[in-house]
Regions:
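Active-site hotspot residues in diverse enzymes, especially metal/ion-binding acidic/histidine motifs
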Residues: 1-168
């Protein structure tokens, strides 16, 4: 099943960052964990949102260019086995799929109800559709929240105002 591009809301990076921050805040407020880097995307997916992470080389995942997918009804995030031992790609893939959960789940389920298809979301090879671009943006904000990046920058280099000559 394909999305009708007219149904996909166009979200600004600021909107997407807010959704990622909302997930992080909700996770921190409803768990015994204090948030720190690296962001525990597996724990957020499994313990906070109730997803099962499945490492697979079956079916479409025989193609190593397809890194992950999400099955909303079964609460499964599938990750291509070829990236299991590549921490950065593995974490980004899970964060990307969480982006679909937070940004596209309701729309995808609505469209799938209209067509009676199982709601599995993954990207085919080729140009990235808007949903994939948005999920990538979400993943980057989830994995590197601005507040942590700014704090690390200031710790490493000092006052950002001096570096960028902002002069407030």
């Amino acid at each position: 099943m394909n999305f009708d591009l007219n149904d996909i809301p166009k979200l600004s990076d600021t909107d997407i960052e807010q959704v990622a921050n909302d997930l992080l805040n909700d996770y921190e407020n409803n768990s015994q964990w204090t948030l720190h880097c690296p962001i525990p995307v597996e724990r957020i997916a499994e313990k906070h949102l109730g997803y099962h992470i499945e490492i697979t080389d079956d079916d479409i995942y025989k193609d190593t260019e397809i890194l992950g997918g999400i099955v909303f009804e079964d609460k499964v995030i599938q990750v291509n086995g070829s990236i299991e031992n590549h921490d950065g790609r593995y974490s980004f893939t899970i964060a990307h799929e969480l982006g679909h959960h937070c940004l596209h789940k309701e729309l995808f389920q609505k469209l799938s109800m209209e067509s009676d298809e199982h709601t599995k979301m993954c990207r085919e090879t080729g140009e990235k559709p808007l949903t994939e671009q948005q999920a990538d943006t979400f993943a980057s904000y989830l994995l590197m929240p601005t507040k942590f990046v700014n704090k690390a920058y200031i710790k490493a280099f000092g006052d950002t105002n001096e570096v960028f000559d902002i002069g407030y």
